[in-house]
Amino acid sequence: MLEKRYLVLEDGSYYEGYRLGSDDLSIGEIVFNTAMTGYQETISDPSYTGQIITFTYPLIGNYGINRDDFESLTPKLNGVVVKEASTHPSNFRHQKTLHETLAQYHIPGISGVDTRSITRKIRNYGVLRAGFTDNKDNIQELVEQLKTAELPRDEVQTVSTKTPYVSTGSDLSVVLLDFGKKQNIVRELNLRGCNVTVVPYDTSAEEILGMSPDGVMLSNGPGDPDEVDVALDMIRGILGKIPFFGICLGHQLFALSQGATSFKMKFGHRGANHPVKDLRTGKIDITSQNHGYSIDCDSLKNTDLEVTHIALNDGTVEGLRHKELPAFSVQYHPEARPGPSDSNYLFDEFIAMMKDFKEKERQINA
């Protein structure tokens, strides 16, 4: 017999469903993701650290979970909400069910709830604190706890690598600042022959330049960019000295380092179907996104940055480029996983930028 579980929101509403995953109940910021596939990559994305994900697609877990498709070593999210969780996956690669995987990583979840209603609530009122209980009598107590709960801060410290390591390639050398990177960023660089050195988020500009890389990338990651101000001096210290490419949180930190400001979005962009327009070409890409903060377009007016991409759904900033220096960034995920590969070409642009910069340096020193 399925055991009851309750998803409780800070506004006092609650949803009755069935126990999924761990009995280690937790609270977090509840968000929604609109991707139809890729639930495993989503669950293992470090950018969701401390959050509770509501999947809008009604059936999750139907092809199971396998270790090879994880985007990080250990999922760090605080909960999963689904309409229906598959108990009999059908895929020759699957190793565990969704329930077994969540239990293994001490992640609570709930199934059998109206995910459309939850999504509409988040859409209309913004992200909310939420938590789980297995006892209906504890709901009001949990509501009061949620109203005053301090959600985790500085999540980047939790998910960043503690020591540098190398993913070997044969050509250009790239230093990747790990703010909570997805593994597919490393894969995409390796596929293009890059030797990737992954370093902690608080590595200094001097340390990076001492490695003599051909380029620097700033990864995605969780939380508020204003809480990662340790990276701003590092960015300013390397700009112009080596080519630069920022993704998601890395994009936001790039903007902040040049004097722009960020703001918390009502419910963010999370899914694999977000249209983005390249203002340089007029081309529209369907992109994978996962962010709850955005750069204030007006704050860019007195900076050396220009907007290169915008979101078609709400007009927010999705891409930036420095007007003088070899540096650019995007708010979305060109590495996908999950999502379409429309924007893979941005890795090729970064490779071309590094080669061009290297050739100019060679000519200057000749």
UniProtKB/Swiss-Prot annotation:
**Protein origin, superkingdom:** Bacteria
Q: Cross-referenced CDD domains, in alphabetical order? A: GATase1_CPSase
The UniProt record gives the binding positions of L-glutamine as 47, 221, 223, 249, 252, 290, 292-293
Q: What's this protein's function?
A: Small subunit of the glutamine-dependent carbamoyl phosphate synthetase (CPSase). CPSase catalyzes the formation of carbamoyl phosphate from the ammonia moiety of glutamine, carbonate, and phosphate donated by ATP, constituting the first step of 2 biosynthetic pathways, one leading to arginine and/or urea and the other to pyrimidine nucleotides. The small subunit (glutamine amidotransferase) binds and cleaves glutamine to supply the large subunit with the substrate ammonia.
- Glutamine amidotransferase type-1 domain location: 173-360
* Record PANTHER family: CARBAMOYL-PHOSPHATE SYNTHASE SMALL CHAIN, MULTIFUNCTIONAL TRYPTOPHAN BIOSYNTHESIS PROTEIN-RELATED
| Active site: residue positions | 248 (nucleophile), 333, 335
Question: Which species is this UniProt entry from?
Answer: Staphylococcus epidermidis (strain ATCC 12228 / FDA PCI 1200)
Fetch the Pfam families from UniProt.
CPSase_sm_chain, GATase
Give one GO term, molecular function aspect: ATP binding
Q: Where is the signal peptide?
A: none
Provide the transmembrane region boundaries: none
Catalysed reaction equations from the record? hydrogencarbonate + L-glutamine + 2 ATP + H2O = carbamoyl phosphate + L-glutamate + 2 ADP + phosphate + 2 H(+)
Q: What is this protein called?
A: Carbamoyl phosphate synthase small chain
Family under the similarity heading: Belongs to the CarA family.
**What are the UniProt keywords, alphabetically?**
Amino-acid biosynthesis, Arginine biosynthesis, ATP-binding, Glutamine amidotransferase, Ligase, Nucleotide-binding, Pyrimidine biosynthesis
Top-rank EC class of the record's enzyme: ligase
Provide one Gene Ontology biological process annotation. 'de novo' pyrimidine nucleobase biosynthetic process
The segments labelled CPSase in the record are 1-171
**Subunit note:** Composed of two chains; the small (or glutamine) chain promotes the hydrolysis of glutamine to ammonia, which is used by the large (or ammonia) chain to synthesize carbamoyl phosphate. Tetramer of heterodimers (alpha,beta)4.
SMART domains in the record:
CPSase_sm_chain
Q: What is its EC number?
A: 6.3.5.5
Q: In which pathway does it act?
A: Amino-acid biosynthesis; L-arginine biosynthesis; carbamoyl phosphate from bicarbonate: step 1/1; Pyrimidine metabolism; UMP biosynthesis via de novo pathway; (S)-dihydroorotate from bicarbonate: step 1/3
